[in-house]
């Protein structure tokens, strides 16, 4: 079924898993546009309360009877094939559409759609670009994969031709998007439960770049060899960024303050544009900022608005998020779940004025832990001590493929101070016995490891 965002406003649309970050944003866009929306999720949440207050009919729990007088059912890749609502829709011959295709259909209703892709950094880059476009009063519609204070959550409904969204490569989802501007932040090994290897991943990003029209733009990280190759092969306009001089946009004269935030000069094709100080820490965030600046230049946003937007951007929740301080111990939470991200997070922490860094890491999915096992043994060197939790299964089942105990043994064999724990309370009790004033407690992972830090602050 095709879906016309402009014309099909008489349709009732049901979302299976409406409380998810992306699905809730899509539902909000439709509600604001006058559609009748229903949905279901396995638990209540603040996001669901917000949708209810906007007029959505939401059920807690997935049941066949929830599919009632529905014209279209939208679902995500995380929904199993035996989901009762999915089965009911099929039996009733109700049109089905997966989340990525549906998002792509909505994007077609916006002239200037921007799709931010890459293995790492999508949420932060989208957050930065959101702040910049808001500073310039472009009134964008925004879908971001995290909670952003500036827009009061994970979505913003605009009334302009500008549309900003993350574009995930998992199961080739982003190949269903029609971007006017596409960003490729980086290409790394991930989602190896779906992709065969890094070459297949890179080929998928190449296909993504070919979705951009000839008068559109591809923005890419020039220092990433695979991204650079795609920049040279695409048929649209290109704009590159990086630390090397062969990039169109570069950062020079870089300095970091005591909070790990960078100040630097932005150069375009050898010309100094302006000086900027970021409000998010880490060298990797210089690159995210440069990517967002590239898009800003494409849209002729003024330097003043770029500087204002980036200065105001404190990042999304769960992206090196300051949670609080107790007895001189700082608690920070980060979503990092890939070795490259973990390295960047710990490197950022090292730049700050802390005594010792205690890192509690919760691996995310068995397939990722197994596929990147060797890389995981090399990414925690900047932690003074690692507390390793059991693997967070997410969409997977434990088949004995790999365990946190095995990873812990490998890390200890490399000389890292590491202990394994098997519950949030065990992790909490351990760090409470070790932490002293001046230390940093860093909870890392895409699961529910954040609970440990939050409990510590309430102790």
From Swiss-Prot:
GO biological processes: cell division; cell wall organization; peptidoglycan biosynthetic process; regulation of cell shape
GO MF, one example: ATP binding
EC number: 6.3.2.8
Gene3D superfamilies: Mur ligase, C-terminal domain, Mur-like, catalytic domain, NAD(P)-binding Rossmann-like Domain
InterPro entries from the UniProt entry: Mur-like_cat_sf (IPR036565), Mur_ligase_C (IPR004101), Mur_ligase_C_dom_sf (IPR036615), Mur_ligase_cen (IPR013221), Mur_ligase_N (IPR000713), MurCDEF_pg_biosynth (IPR050061), UDP-N-AcMur_Ala_ligase_MurC (IPR005758)
Pathway: Cell wall biogenesis; peptidoglycan biosynthesis
Localization annotation: Cytoplasm
Binding-site residues for ATP, renumbered to this chain: 118-124
Keyword Glycoprotein: no
Catalytic reactions on record: UDP-N-acetyl-alpha-D-muramate + L-alanine + ATP = UDP-N-acetyl-alpha-D-muramoyl-L-alanine + ADP + phosphate + H(+)
Enzyme class: ligase
UniProt keyword annotations, A-Z: ATP-binding, Cell cycle, Cell division, Cell shape, Cell wall biogenesis/degradation, Cytoplasm, Ligase, Nucleotide-binding, Peptidoglycan synthesis
Any single Gene Ontology cellular-component annotation: cytoplasm
Pfam families: Mur_ligase (PF01225), Mur_ligase_C (PF02875), Mur_ligase_M (PF08245)
Classification via SUPFAM superfamilies: MurCD N-terminal domain (SSF51984), MurD-like peptide ligases, catalytic domain (SSF53623), MurD-like peptide ligases, peptide-binding domain (SSF53244)
HAMAP family per record: MurC
Family designation: Belongs to the MurCDEF family.
Task of the protein: Cell wall formation.
NCBIfam families documented for this protein: murC
Name of the protein in its database record: UDP-N-acetylmuramate--L-alanine ligase
Organism, scientific name: Clostridium beijerinckii (strain ATCC 51743 / NCIMB 8052) (Clostridium acetobutylicum)
Classification of source organism: Bacteria, Bacillati, Bacillota, Clostridia, Eubacteriales
